[in-house]
From Swiss-Prot:
Cell location: Apical cell membrane
Effect of disrupting the coding gene: Disrupts the polyamine uptake and/or transport of the polyamine conjugate Ant-4,4 and norspermidine, a toxic structural analog of the polyamine spermidine. Intracellular levels of the natural polyamines spermidine and putrescine are as wild-type. Double knockout with either odc-1 or smd-1 (two enzymes involved in polyamine synthesis) results in a reduced brood size, delayed postembryonic development and reduced intracellular levels of spermidine.
Intervals, Cytoplasmic compartment: 1-68, 231-242, 319-414, 473-935, 984-1007, 1068-1085, 1142-1203
Side Extracellular, residues: 90-209, 264-297, 436-451, 957-962, 1029-1046, 1107-1120
Protein name: Cation-transporting ATPase catp-5
Gene Ontology cellular-component terms listed: apical plasma membrane; membrane
Name of the coding gene: catp-5
Purpose: Involved in the uptake and/or transport of polyamines, probably through ATP hydrolysis. This contributes to the maintenance of intracellular polyamine levels. Polyamines are essential for cell proliferation and are implicated in cellular processes, ranging from DNA replication to apoptosis.
Reaction catalysed by this enzyme: ATP + H2O = ADP + phosphate + H(+)
UniProt-annotated catalytic positions: D503
Amino acid sequence: MNTSEREPLLDTTTRNRVYDTTDNPSTKIMKREKDNPKAKTTSFNQGKLNIGEETCDLYAYKETIGRQILFWLLTIVTLGFYQLLAYWVKSLFVKVRFQPTSHDECEYVMVEDIHGTQTIKEVFKAESDVGLARPTRSGKQEKVKVMRFFTYRKIKYIWYEKDQEWLNPADMDSAAPFNIYQKLTLDVIGLKEQDVIASRKIYNMNALALALTPILVILFKEVLGPFYLFQCFSVALWYSDNYAYYASVIVIITVGSAAVAVYQMRAQEKRIRNMVGDTISVIVRRDGHDITIDASEIVPMDILILPSNTFILPCDCLLMNGTVIVNEAMLTGESVPVTKASLKEADECGPEIRLSSEHNRHTLFSGTTVLQTRNYKGQPVMARVIRTGFSTLKGQLVRSIMYPKPQEKEALKDVMVFILVLGFIALIGFIYTVIEMVSRGESLKHIIIRSLDIITIVVPPALPAAMSVGIINANSRLKKKKIFCTSPTTVNVCGLINVACFDKTGTLTEDGLDFNCLKAIRKNEDGKPEFTSEFEELDPVKLSAENANLNIVVAAASCHSLTRIDGTLHGDPLELILVEKSKWIIEEAVNSDEETQDFDTVQPTVLRPPPEQATYHPENNEYSVIKQHPFNSALQRMSVIISTPSEHSAHDMMVFTKGSPEMIASLCIPDTIPEDYMEVVDEYAQRGFRLIAVASKAVHLNFAKALKTPRDIMESELEFLGLIVMENRLKDVTLSVINELSVANIRCVMVTGDNLLTAMSVARECGIIRPTKKAFLITHSKTEKDPLGRTKLFIKESVSSSENDIDTDSEVRAFDRKAVLRTATYQMAIAGPTYSVITHEYPELVDRITAMCDVYARMAPDQKAQLIGALQEIGAKVSMCGDGANDCAALKAAHAGISLSQAEASIAAPFTSNVPDIRCVPTVIKEGRCALVTSYAVSKYMAAYSLNEFLSVMLLYNDGTNISDGQFLYIDLVLITLVALFLGNTEASRKLSGIPPPRRLATSAFYFSVFGQMFFNIITQTTGYLLVRGQSWYVPNPEELDNTTTMIGTTVFFTSCCMYLGYAFVYSKGHPYRRSVFTNWLLCGIIFVIGAINMVMIFTNMGFLMNLMGFVYVPSTSMRFILLAISLAGVFLSLLYEHFFVEKVVAIHFESYLRQRRLRNGDPSLSAYEKILAAIGSSPRWFEDEINLSKSIDRKETIESKC
């Protein structure tokens, strides 16, 4: 096949929508251009880069000699400081280093994503005299002599001059019509060598190449952070001032924290690389020959020969012939084998049809496991490669893990603001010190060192390390509870969680379904059908006793898609349970060659009842399944054709169909359905049971006609046989955990792939739908449109478990674009297809629907991640708990992803629980709250300590003296380091409080606390200072003595030491997020020991201690008691101030007042989530002012709503 005739295939590469195989990519491209007028280049060097549904800004640059000289000149003049700033701020780098230019001739591009992350990439050129064939949207190839490209986040982007866009070649393949793929099934020759070479220049290798970043590079990036550099500056200053001991301690702490950070990054890289796995050898057909190559050498449009043994697919491909049974657990999270059909069985379609989810039954996805292949004798099973490398399904998953959404920068911003405030104070002290020392005639070196020393005192270099103490302790406690964290910084974020999302199956409920009962059909005295009583077994004896139709047993044993692989039945656990309950015997071909190669002959599965049931099937003890119509989610059913030959006819056959109660009822003859059918169905559904309706009909056809008769004809005019009731039990802890979270005002949300009815039932059972609230279902009509041509939406009431689940009698009204529900005393539920309609056609409703819906059913994996993103967009702090690989994208997107799995999901999530239930969620939140408030407390403690020490130094500088090195060392190393180290050792509260912790560090309560303590410091130290100076026995420091060994310095030291210890109690608040400080026996022990040492220093006159600390003996014992009393009074006032004024008045009343005022004024700093909830909660009839429409909905007095 000639390269120019290649017709490449579709790609659905996204980052936010990792598993998106539902949308037409070419439509997405056109939609983006239509919706975004800036999709084209808006200025000569600015453009847009489309990555799935994310649009990044793109800027084009080139190098010039003059700008390079300017760049290096600035670097030299600033002693490298400019280079450092340019490293932190990429835009500053490109403004000096590069010259803006057009994209047609650029040498570099800067990509800025929607989160503001900037990345500079070099543009490369590929040239060929014979021309390079690159894909186009039409599916054709166009030849160019020069191709310009760059690689961003593992994906190659090529410059298309005509379109004036950078495009991913795999995305361009996506525009090819689907009928092209169908035509390619006739080509079994494969690519020629020149085609392969040409493809490799366009597409990257089929390998998820993840080279480990060198440790030195990781370390270099880590230590170039502002905090690390400030620590280096401080340490250098201290060493130059002979303050070596504390400097060495800071060095040890800094090196340790950097080592931990490097280790965590390297461990994460290794985990991702292990997930990718090694490459394998595969067989491809090229130029008519089957050759074995490494999987990394596969290119798009290769023909892959699928082996009959189990193996993992290395790429995405379309099945050309035969059938393949695959395990798509990596895609769907369900380990149920799926049968894939070849393209030859696909319906003929026109050029307007693109690859979509409707064609997934022909698509084999990378990372999924092939269990079995079947084809005609002597012919291999072949598949056409359509996506390779990071464009595949698995590649998208890996990229979503490698390039996650960055954590919110609010906390870092608050810390920086706080440091700037301290820096301003330090600047005042710096100026004062310079003026004071110049006036005293100090040397220039002394002035510089002492002035800079003020900065290191006020802005503590150990602040980042101290703030991480709570995180380290929380991680340690989580590990003891078998919860493992790969991203420690996420722990603090967990303390802010206010929305907890859960998958259903395997997370809230047990993994599998259990058989509950059977309700068969019998004829009553009037000959009308009615339900029998419940049967706990598929027992013909008991069924016969009630004159039930025994065909329901045959249906349970035969109507399934189970497959025998290596002698063992594999398939849907539900079907395995039914076959086991029936006790029937299933016989298939026993030889592997027979299993996989005799696909061209009719080789039916044979079913036999057990010997003890033979008397109940006298006419036929052997049944043959001659055809299977697999389950189709759109049709909501599956069916089989069973040959039941008798002595009267060899053409007797039965069709058995099972599916959803609604669908099966619509296919049955009405006279065969009991009158109370819907009442019975609703009764079971609202109790959380999964119902399977079963029906049958007899047909008289020969084998050939039976195989060719259309499915819709075979599945019509059925006789209803009964209902099979399956139970998906809640896990033991689910109800208590959901209740604990709800009581703590943490919103619980179910996000599941199950149907809406079952999801609502389970949600009510576990407490997500609260019994005190009404619930409403948002649905849509596939056929009805509103006046604007959009899909029509509807709202129904779902009532309590004591009534029917869906109120079908209530008035159902259209849901208009301006409609919103008016009361906070309700909850909502929605299915994935309806949610998709809203996001695409009613974008203005997305925020309110996202804020109010608590049950999301029929959600695809990409929709789960989309929902998490929508919740984050309105300002919610979201956790996601799931157990399947289909939850990976959502786990990674959430602020706190918690995996209950050890597979792919555990790699995507920062938390993994070895206890497979949701009790880990409140545990993580409690530990997160504890770590968060500990970080706040340590921040305030370090700030109070710094300001305390700053005041001491300022007082002593005024007296021409300073704190001695021994005193500095005791304060910094013993008082502060030890206390800060154990301050975070207080455990989390056992109860999850209903009051959330402060969302930000920089609150009014924080600053009132820090500066209030500063005020008490000033009073305490100044009082002691003035008292001692006013005594008759006070002797000023002689000029010939060291100016750090003074009586006034000793006095200031004594008074400040008590304040340091007092802060440990002031900032060790327990309730409601931590346990009492007295449970932290290590901290209490440290405080007791240090307090005793302080008493010894104040009241004794030991020579070695006086010399070591630089003390001057205070001759008056009464004055020492007075100094102690002043210090204790200061501590007591600090405690009262913090407890009563800061925590009661400021944190509660003043903060509440500010919050209410911001809500009234529509402050943009408040999240949309808060505004929506506040509006609904404060005014139950708020919508009437906007819509001026209300109407009571039927007898149940449901909500008044403009629909």
